[in-house]
């Protein structure tokens, strides 16, 4: 009995050491990835996976590193494996959706975004906002305007400072000739991100259509100053 207990305690100790070692390599890999040292990150993450084959975080992060290297088949394998060992972990679905977009598999990406949205914790509001933003952009590229607006609206509810969601919804409203709604979204977008030249450009065009020439020229000149190329011609045409 004592021998069995000793063996069990030793097994638990080895298991804990393996998990600790895997997590240490994972953190090392993440740090290297943030520094742009992708190859070194993959080497560290290889060790994390060798120490614990079911470390879904390590598999997902290595998938991201492979994706950055454009090694799409390896990224796919890691995301698939992460989902297999942790099917309720939203991040591999999120990242696999990005991979599928790069591979022009839009239907597959849409499904993965939807799964990630279903699984993302309520506490992860920023990540959830980005998921709705990305799925909304996918709907928009497929000319599914109302689903796109619905997703952008949800993204904004989760993060009122999501400048890209505000811009995208404003752009759809602009195309629908809903000028008041477009103006409001473009204005909030530039307030959320004062360096967002494209949003200043959209705001300027909406202001022009709303007979606010002085305000429009200020917005267009700001877009030009921020380096948004289309603003150059707009300033020359409307603000001289």
Where are these regions (language model features)?
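Hydrophobic helical h-region of N-terminal Sec-dependent signal peptides
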Residues: 11-13
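Alpha-helical tetratricopeptide repeat
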Residues: 2-7, 17-240
